[in-house]
C-alpha cells in the first residue's frame, strides 16, 4: 500500500 508522508 502506498505511504504518504
From Swiss-Prot:
Annotated compartments: Secreted
Cellular component aspect of the GO annotation: extracellular region
Keywords, comma-separated and alphabetical: Secreted
Tissue occurrence: Expressed by the venom gland.
Designated name of the protein: Cryptide Pep-25
Amino acid at each position: 500500500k502506498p505511504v504518504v508522508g
